[in-house]
Amino acid sequence: MILQALTAYYEQLLKQGKVEAPGWDSRFKVSYELRLGPDGQLLALNDLRQEVPKGKKTVIAPRELPVPHRVKRASGVAANFLCDNTSYLLGADEKGKPERSRQCFEACAALHHKVLDGVDSPAAKAILAFLDSWEPDTAPTHPLLAEQWADLNNNANLVFGCESPDGAHWLATTDDAIRTAWQSAFDTSDADAETARCLITGKEAGIARIHPAIKGVMGAQAAGAALVSFNAPAFCSYGHEQGANAPVSEYAAFAYTTALNLLLADRNCCQRIGDTTIVCWAENAAPAYSNAMLMFFCGGAEARGVSESDLAAALKALSQGRPVSFLDDKLDPNQNFYVLGISPNAARLSVRFFLHSSFGQFAKNLQDHADRLEITRPAFDKRENLSVWALAQETVNQKSRDKSPSPQLVGDLLRAILTGGPYPATLLNGVTLRIRAEREVTRGRAAILKAYYLRNYPTELNKEVFTVSLNESSNVPYVLGRLFSVLETIQSVANPGINATIKDRYFNSACATPATAFPTLVKLAQKHLQKMTTPNEVHFSKQLTELMAQLPETGFPARLSLPEQGAFEIGYYHQTQKRYAKKNEEE
């Protein structure tokens, strides 16, 4: 299903003229042009790099160009057509293995002769003449190359270019005769390949022995990783070797890898969260869908020129099945949409999740998630929404050296949000541990508690307790949380400027075993009330009386279960935020 969806995406892009036909890589980073004269002499080394924005600064980066399809290299010698590194195009490098460099150059010359012999094109003749006359030993000291030799050997890719006697010049990759010759060679390259019925297209075709590499996954090998590979006998069946174990045609292998590489290279379609790289796309290949989806669950709308209010309005409309105009495009809630999560695993890629639904259904799941997370927030917290990464960070000790949340948690949380399924128990466990360790109920932690219990245990009692702001529920754990917050306030008012409050010493015991903590705290509060002025004493005594009246006659509970502790923490958070809100209004 994954490969079929990616292949269909490639074919849609091909119809729209956004990708090259099979046999060509649409985007490849090229740094320099080797410009040749009609007789094959090297006329110039042209720098193709360009300035691109990176964060708040500008950097020099290679230019992305369409080039002939790249071979997948292992440890052997394998040349690429028209575009390669100095080892192949010039026969020299700084790796200290001159014999291997010469072998690379010879392989390059052999490939170009195989493709271009007999081609009636000045550019083709110039390239062959260059390869026949070039002396690799002269490359490092060549007057046109010496100054840039260090840069040329810094993982730079070069491409052949040509110049006519009248001064006109062009890249060899754009020469019609050369493109035709290469296309013919590529189309017949699998003539000797094993044939079988392709699992993706359903057609009898030559099977790809090794699939092209996937690049751009954070944490994977720089040379690329494989989504489909068989590199040990234990992975093979019925005597098949490598790609024959999962027959995918050369065309389909090219199509799905091209599509995935394009998605990974586009920041509007790709986002990394933890060790998971997420790519998403619409069936019609309109980029606005991917752009909007990443804003919905990863944030960053302001950086893309979209206000939080406009984003929220678009999400709400789509969740209700209404089309909206967004980023100069119309988003249809019925459009098929795909989300793929992948993680690095040595030379392979692991699929964390693959989701397919209508764009409107994804929007509804995200809207429901946002509604469950909604909770009153401190005045200093300006965030309209909490991203997936922000939620995962609430489970991590921010003072530790490694502040990365569990990759498994991030993946499970993403799946739950996008499918509308139950939140992972590890999310609740992580938040509970942080609250116990730090005795702090932040906005993010309170929002997680609220969302978790409303989604995983949608009882009437939970709907009554886990609300956006303070409510008058008589639920005992919730009332106890409110009571603890009031007791803390009484202590702070009676002893202004104290460094530690009852929260630092009693929060965990009050939350888990109220009967052991609250009698002491209530007695302590009476002493604090005596220190106050009469208006404050009356005000807080009234609050204490109202809350104590809602507790059972049997007294404080001996212990609270985990869900009840969640209600306690929400009650504490609600009451505390009401206190701060009132203080801000007075100021």
Spans of features found by a protein language model:
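Short microdomains enriched in Cys/His and/or Lys/Arg
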Residues: 209-245
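Conserved phosphate-interacting/catalytic interface
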Residues: 1-190, 235-587
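Short, solvent-exposed secondary-structure capping/transition elements
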Residues: 207-211, 268-269
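Short Cys/His-rich metal-coordination motifs, predominantly Zn2+-binding knuckles/fingers
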Residues: 201-204
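Short metal-coordination and nucleic-acid-contact micro-motifs, chiefly zinc-binding Cys/His arrays
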Residues: 190-196
